[in-house]
Structures are given as C-alpha cells and as structure tokens.
Regions:
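Cytosolic/nucleoplasmic/matrix-facing N-terminal domains/tails
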Residues: 1-79
Length: 79
C-alpha cells in the first residue's frame, strides 16, 4: 500500500469507522472501498468509476479530493 491507500485507511481508522460503516454511509460497495485502500485499480470496471469513488470516499472522510486525485493520476498515468 502506498501513499493514497494509506491516506484512506488511516483517515477511516482515525475516525473509528469500519469498512461496513463507510459502505452504509456512502452507498459504495465494500469491495470498492477496500480496493481504494489497497490501490487495486483493476477491481473497478472502468477508470471513471475509480475516479468517482475516490472523490466520494475522500469527501466522506473529510480529505481533499483534488489533492488525492492528483496523487491518483500520478500513480496511474502511463509513461
């Protein structure tokens, strides 16, 4: 797990939330929330889903979606 996944996981744990809590509150499947925390991008059906879910999860956890999107794009862009 690198910076992005750790950021999500640490924010969730600091708030005392389980993945089940996050699933209920965001209506995002636990499978996708777990994939965000593990940075397992192949779980998502298309890149648009990973970006949208990343924004939603970041906002829910009180994180800066724009900053995390920049990290995501840097990690996933092709050389």
């Amino acid at each position: 797990m690198s910076e992005l996944g750790k950021t999500f996981s640490q924010a969730r744990i600091q708030r005392g939330l389980t993945l089940e809590d996050c699933e209920r509150d965001t209506r995002l499947s636990r499978r996708y929330l777990d994939a965000l925390e593990r940075e397992d991008w192949k779980v998502f059906p298309a890149p648009v889903y990973s970006r949208a879910f990343l924004r939603t999860y970041a906002q829910y956890l009180g994180l800066n979606p724009a900053e995390l999107m920049r990290v995501f794009q840097a990690q996933t862009e092709e050389p």
